[in-house]
Amino acid sequence: MLAKRLSSILPPLTLEEALDTTKIHSIAGILSPGQALVTRRPFRAPHHTASDAGLLGGTAHPLPGEISIAHNGVLFLDELPEFKRSVLETMRQPLEEGQVTISRAAGTVTYPADFMLVAAMNPSPDGKMPAQSQCSPREIQRYLGKISGPLLDRIDMHVEVPLVPFREIAATASSESSQSIRARVIASRQIQHQRFQNHKQITHNASMPPRLLKEHCSLSREPFELLKKAMEDLHLSARAYDRILKVARTIADLTDSASISSEHLAEAIQYRSLDRQLWS
């Protein structure tokens, strides 16, 4: 449900994004009859049995795969460890570059693939937390080990979802609406648009190259020491360092803060849970 709702809080497609998305959907042959323009961000949820060609693109005449059809939208991979490892590993380059190149006998084609990846997985093969699982530690580690470290490095946020008590499920308390959240997201995107107005290829914090991190993600002494300790204690990679700074910058934007505070950074660090020992 979380993944399906995500597209409802994202900003509307710009005209340029709508045109790019429409072109891809037209090539893939999935435009609805009479549809002239795609106006809503795509949401794609391929099954874990999807082939390399189905997910990345292919066939004799290279057609867009799910990652390109999800361009400017959301790609949801449920039961992530159940996908073929070869398929997941070939997603690393598109996640980094926002495009995918398909080579076939008929020629080579490069399609856009700038999507938001959302993935879900169980903590063990039987779906239970390790302490309650009937699986052996070796089976659990083999299951979790299907997701490589380099792929996890390219996922900005890792969120552990605990069991929800019945009283919370049955509660009638109101929650923040998607419309309200979307307004904050749009305001944050406007801040980022102003930040990168002199860099046409950069539209949001996630696409910020390393050379701009020092300029837009500078830290005062306290946040710097916090990040240093996290990097050393959790043995985080250089790529995780970039991800943490970008997420912290975005959290600061959502609160309309010009600088990254220790609170913003601490929240970003705790989203690297899969970089630590899994569900210890």
Task: Cite the ranges covered by each PLM segment.
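Walker A/P-loop
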Residues: 1-32, 97
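Basic, amphipathic alpha-helical bundle interface domains used for macromolecular binding and assembly
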Residues: 61-62, 85-279
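Conserved alpha-helical scaffold flanking the Walker A/P-loop in AAA+ ATPase domains
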Residues: 37-42, 47-75, 108
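Inter-lobe coupling/hinge segments of SF2-like helicase ATPases
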Residues: 25, 34-37, 86-87
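Walker B catalytic acidic pair
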Residues: 72, 78-80, 90
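Long, charged amphipathic helices and adjacent flexible linkers at domain junctions
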Residues: 31-45, 185, 199
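Residues immediately C-terminal
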Residues: 75-76, 82-83, 166
